[in-house]
Amino acid sequence: MKIEAVIFDWAGTTVDYGCFAPLEVFMEIFHKRGVGITAEEARKPMGLLKIDHVRALTEMPRIANEWNRIFGKLPTETDIQEMYEEFEEILFAILPRYASPIHGVKEVIASLRERGIKIGSTTGYTREMMDIVAKEAALQGYKPDFLVTPDDVPAGRPYPWMCYKNAMELGVYPMNHMIKIGDTVSDMKEGRNAGMWTVGVILGSSELGLSEEEVENMDPAELREKIEVVRNRFVENGAHFTIETMQELESVMERIEKQELIIS
């Protein structure tokens, strides 16, 4: 079996180490309404279409109960739409600052292309958001062959449609000749639902939720413990493989190709 294409996520996988761009904005739009949410809560639905992310936050029991305590009712679809509009406005202003390729990504992409492998991508950002991110990332040397957003298909993650559209546009089939790599639980589900080899990357991921500085300064034993928690979470949600950095991706590909592994 030969791997013919790799489909990458964006924030937390190829750009925006730690996936910090949306995090503070999610927390801010709830805080403005007197409902405090933690970074851990804000990260949990990461990878979903952003309005679905806001909706998922309002459905968390603790957050819903706090909202009910303050407003005397549960969040409505109108509340969700209003918060999402605020989220978009704030995020658009800061996105250019969070589009730098993560260390090592450009080198891995170049190596894959030398092997004739096509590069696709999926995201939880809208097309309008990605117009900003993709343009800035391209200026800094990262440009996949194809990009699909949830706006381009009937539904975003965990549905497989973005991966299928990549496959069609890149001209690659069957799906087990492709790898999906991402940094969230929804990425793992997307890849598995699409019938692809699915890989979770840990350092720089939203699931780990640490900045480069925090990783560098953390006690090695504590960091190792956090890495293993994320690794287990990826595996529990369908990852065939986990890697700590993007530089390990090609060794995963070689395992798939040389051992003639079968997707299960």
From Swiss-Prot:
One Pfam family matching this protein: Hydrolase
Molecular function GO terms recorded: magnesium ion binding; phosphoglycolate phosphatase activity; phosphonoacetaldehyde hydrolase activity
Binding site for Mg(2+): D9, A11, D183
Reaction catalyzed: phosphonoacetaldehyde + H2O = acetaldehyde + phosphate + H(+)
Keyword Magnesium: yes
Gene Ontology BP, a term: DNA repair
Keyword Metal-binding belongs to the record: yes
GO CC aspect terms: cytosol
Keyword set, alphabetical order: Hydrolase, Magnesium, Metal-binding, Schiff base
Cofactors, names only: Mg(2+)
Classification via InterPro entries: HAD-like_hydrolase_sf, HAD-like_sf, HAD-SF_hydro_IA, HAD_sf, PGP-like_dom2, Phosphonoacetald_hydro
Record EC number: 3.11.1.1
Gene3D superfamilies: HAD superfamily/HAD-like (3.40.50.1000), Putative phosphatase, domain 2 (1.10.150.240)
Active-site residue numbers: D9, K50
Superkingdom of this protein's organism: Bacteria
Coiled coil: none
Cofactor descriptive note: Binds 1 Mg(2+) ion per subunit.
NCBIfam families in alphabetical order: HAD-SF-IA-v1 (TIGR01549), HAD-SF-IA-v3 (TIGR01509), phosphonatase (TIGR01422)
Assembly notes: Homodimer.
Protein function: Involved in phosphonate degradation.
Family label: Belongs to the HAD-like hydrolase superfamily. PhnX family.
Protein name: Phosphonoacetaldehyde hydrolase
